[in-house]
């Protein structure tokens, strides 16, 4: 039985004050809510403060991060390692986000190496996949997603997906206000799962596949009502405690 995961990607947003206010607000909003794992990925500089804030509150919120390097130490200016993230309690690490693929020229192969290194270090990769608007219009959505997943499967085996999370985020829906319909998202999720099932039905059945791309309280329930959508990777709405908590509650209710 897959357990829903709702994760907030704060991207390049926040301040010390915002971190404390948002996390304390989330703790209050989520009191008594069960049946969903809730995670947050603040900017790297705020991971320490987020850990302290969550620990002091005795919070069940999972701490994550937005990136990792391929090394645990060395002459790699500006990077952060899985070992460092572990020391601060971060467990769920986003990799392959379209913004990093585009702005930092991260290839499928490079993302797959990050995936392997996170697994080697006992952390949970949150593997982002998704197509551009042009690829969507050309009918290439499933082929693009399959290629991005196969970069992992072909180098590490399908069992590497056990315990990992896949986040399907159509690039044209990220931060644009446009969102795939729940039915369209379900169709793609089902095809992603079917692609994995070609290698292992057991892995496909158990892997969590989130939807991301303009998820809001108003549309969350429709997504989570779909059988192959196991949660959400949330951007803008994750910066507001009430909105993000409402999305998490919708997941808990839909998957109960």
Swiss-Prot record:
Compartments where located: Cytoplasm
Origin superkingdom: Bacteria
Gene Ontology BP terms: gluconeogenesis; glyceraldehyde-3-phosphate biosynthetic process; glycerol catabolic process; glycolytic process
Broad class of where this protein is predominantly found: cytoplasm
Pathway the protein takes part in: Carbohydrate biosynthesis; gluconeogenesis; Carbohydrate degradation; glycolysis; D-glyceraldehyde 3-phosphate from glycerone phosphate: step 1/1
Cysteines paired by S-S bonds: none
UniProt xrefs under Pfam families: TIM
InterPro entries: Aldolase_TIM, TIM_sf, TrioseP_Isoase_bac/euk, Triosephosphate_isomerase, Triosephosphate_isomerase_AS
EC number: 5.3.1.1
Residues the record lists as binding substrate: 9-11, 175, 214, 235-236
CC terms in the record's Gene Ontology section: cytosol
Protein's UniProt keywords contain Cytoplasm: yes
Catalytic activity entry: D-glyceraldehyde 3-phosphate = dihydroxyacetone phosphate
Keyword presence, Ubl conjugation: no
GO molecular function terms noted in the UniProt entry: triose-phosphate isomerase activity
Enzyme class of the recorded protein, top EC level: isomerase
Keywords on record: Cytoplasm, Gluconeogenesis, Glycolysis, Isomerase
Function noted in UniProt: Involved in the gluconeogenesis. Catalyzes stereospecifically the conversion of dihydroxyacetone phosphate (DHAP) to D-glyceraldehyde-3-phosphate (G3P).
Family: Belongs to the triosephosphate isomerase family.
Full protein name: Triosephosphate isomerase
Native source organism of the sequence: Aliivibrio fischeri (strain ATCC 700601 / ES114)
